[in-house]
């Protein structure tokens, strides 16, 4: 079977993925991509997919068949190649006691685009490979500064922007993971209280694969003029995925999700956003629009979207919230 990017007419390729003969990506339609599944078995049920998907995300078993099984097969090849390279490098360096480090997959994309669903489904599929690898999933939410710190520094309206994260703690965590250390602590976050949970951690104990999900995980930093090594989060990734969609679609999904949450999670008196559950629908929608335009859209333009070309794989979603196009970086 031979499927190439040129099989798609240029008019069918989203403008943000077009790069002519100099494009670093192979681009496939979802239907063509699905054929790369080969004999990869479907190990999830419809009920499990429903449990894994986020609110307002219609991803179903058909989407898993079309997109995620081929992606699982691709990642299996990358993990196997990484293991071979690790053994060869260990022999080259005569390091007989070298500890195998986890294969780290970064998942990035805008708020409301569906990256959490992608990360959860991937983690489940990878854990069900015949080799039964140990797979952990960690999100960057826990590495946000606590609300008390953000309020003190006047950063609550910048929550989700790079400066709202404890980058030092984030880098120390990934460094420890890549060093193969046991029981590395990842701080946890409550979407109910909209805050980091004090003294509560997720223990990550030398997994074979770590799925690391967050909006800004592919972001780079300015390089110092003196050539000093400045680590970036993506330096610790073995493979990276960017979940993409047209801006107008993400906007619509964000507002619709906010309105759905108003009817569900926001009803809880403990919710940080409980006050929005009691106002009129028009007032709530106006607040959602304001949050989108004043915070999330700015973050998308300034910090998230510019990282898209750094991804190894881009999943481009369409109006139905399902993947329409897949772009895979050329080797």
Swiss-Prot record:
<feature type="binding site">
    <location>
        <begin position="109"/>
        <end position="116"/>
    </location>
    <ligand>
        <name>ATP</name>
    </ligand>
</feature>
<dbReference type="GO" id="GO:0005737">
    <property type="term" value="C:cytoplasm"/>
</dbReference>
<keyword id="KW-0963">Cytoplasm</keyword>
<keyword id="KW-0418">Kinase</keyword>
<keyword id="KW-0808">Transferase</keyword>
<protein>
    <recommendedName>
        <fullName>Pantothenate kinase</fullName>
        <ecNumber>2.7.1.33</ecNumber>
    </recommendedName>
</protein>
<dbReference type="InterPro" id="IPR004566">
    <property type="entry name" value="PanK"/>
</dbReference>
<keyword id="KW-0547">Nucleotide-binding</keyword>
<dbReference type="Pfam" id="PF00485">
    <property type="entry name" value="PRK"/>
</dbReference>
<dbReference type="GO" id="GO:0004594">
    <property type="term" value="F:pantothenate kinase activity"/>
</dbReference>
<comment type="pathway">
    <text>Cofactor biosynthesis; coenzyme A biosynthesis; CoA from (R)-pantothenate: step 1/5.</text>
</comment>
<keyword id="KW-0173">Coenzyme A biosynthesis</keyword>
<dbReference type="InterPro" id="IPR027417">
    <property type="entry name" value="P-loop_NTPase"/>
</dbReference>
<dbReference type="GO" id="GO:0015937">
    <property type="term" value="P:coenzyme A biosynthetic process"/>
</dbReference>
<comment type="similarity">
    <text>Belongs to the prokaryotic pantothenate kinase family.</text>
</comment>
<keyword id="KW-0067">ATP-binding</keyword>
<dbReference type="GO" id="GO:0005524">
    <property type="term" value="F:ATP binding"/>
</dbReference>
<dbReference type="InterPro" id="IPR006083">
    <property type="entry name" value="PRK/URK"/>
</dbReference>
């Amino acid at each position: 079977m031979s499927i190439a990017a040129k099989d798609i007419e240029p008019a069918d390729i989203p403008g943000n993925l077009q790069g002519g003969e100099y494009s670093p990506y192979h681009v496939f339609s979802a239907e063509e991509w699905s054929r790369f599944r080969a004999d990869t078995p479907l190990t999830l049920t419809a009920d499990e997919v429903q449990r894994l998907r986020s609110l307002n995300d219609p991803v179903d078993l058909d989407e898993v068949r079309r997109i995620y099984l081929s992606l699982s097969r691709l990642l299996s090849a990358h993990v196997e190649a990484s293991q071979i390279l690790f053994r060869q490098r260990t022999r080259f360096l005569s390091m007989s006691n070298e500890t195998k480090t986890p294969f780290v997959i970064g998942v990035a994309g805008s708020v409301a685009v569906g990256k959490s669903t992608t990360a959860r489904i991937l983690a489940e599929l990878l854990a069900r490979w015949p080799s039964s690898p140990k797979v952990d999933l960690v999100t960057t939410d826990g590495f946000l500064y606590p609300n008390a710190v953000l309020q003190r520094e006047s950063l609550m309206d910048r929550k989700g922007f790079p400066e709202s994260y404890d980058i030092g703690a984030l880098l120390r965590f990934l460094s420890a993971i890549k060093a193969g250390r046991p029981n590395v602590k990842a701080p946890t976050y409550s979407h109910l209280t909209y805050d980091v949970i004090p003294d509560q951690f997720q223990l990550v104990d030398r997994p074979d694969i770590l799925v690391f999900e967050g909006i800004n995980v592919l972001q780079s930093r300015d390089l110092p003029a003196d050539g000093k090594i400045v680590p970036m989060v993506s330096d610790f990734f073995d493979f990276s995925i960017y979940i993409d969609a047209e801006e107008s679609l993400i906007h619509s999904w964000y507002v619709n999700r906010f309105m759905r949450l108003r009817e569900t999670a926001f009803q809880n008196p403990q919710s940080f956003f409980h006050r929005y559950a009691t106002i009129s629908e028009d007032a709530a929608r106006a607040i959602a629009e304001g949050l989108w335009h004043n915070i999330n859209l700015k973050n998308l333009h300034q910090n998230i979207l510019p990282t898209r070309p750094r991804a190894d794989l881009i999943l481009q979603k369409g109006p139905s919230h399902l993947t329409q196009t897949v772009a895979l970086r050329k080797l």
